[in-house]
């Protein structure tokens, strides 16, 4: 009887093990060169499948991705064809789309109110005219419900306050950033408050000085500090969101690109485009570490997992994406996408399901 009870217990445990494999941890990576979005498992290091975003059959170039876990959708910008696409988070099927116009770049998502804010970037290699526009989209029905003209060329970096009332946007060409009241979208007379990134640049935001080339913005989780990656000056600058005053300057690798803050605001992660490395800054102690791999070349996006233990980094130069263990500062996974198509994959945007 005891032997039979032992065997029954063993089979139950074995059955439970088979039913509960290592949890799939899904992430999305835009492959700008292949008109696809890779859906990957960052725990197993496996590509689950590819989502075709060849929306117009003319080369759409998916650039950036954000996830709405509250309503189970994800969104992707197509910088070449000017669309923003909406997908079902469970099935990865296309739900809806909206045409924005030339170069929709980065997005900020207000999950509670279901609004998307889209920055319109500069044209690539003179393909079209520069934009000065930021759009507000009703994500429920994918319609543009308002636009703000910041007055400066190539708005790119974008960050939304936790209450959804303030949108921060930085020009990539003029060394200014803007504080936009989100309820003023659609008001053609509205000019948002602007701040200079440095005292050494023109006071006018209409001058494309190109001194700092701001790339991405991140807000601290209490909304008190704004982090600005300055790709031309190889630094991240930190500003007070009440006064716009400069609080700190953090030196990085060559050409800092996308940035992420840990949930407790204790660490800053910076993908260095030409430095082919990730700078990790302890904002409490000031200590700086570097994450890198010999195969890395021309970095772009980065994304943190829910508990900040994993960092996903994209590398258009190598055609790969990388997953690092933050605590041990070791490389865990490398994703290659070159076998999907003859064209270079150019992984850019990255987002992890939390």
Predicted features along the sequence, with ranges:
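Sec-dependent N-terminal signal peptides
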Residues: 5-13
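Predominantly soluble domains enriched in secretory-pathway, periplasmic, or organellar proteins
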Residues: 16-354
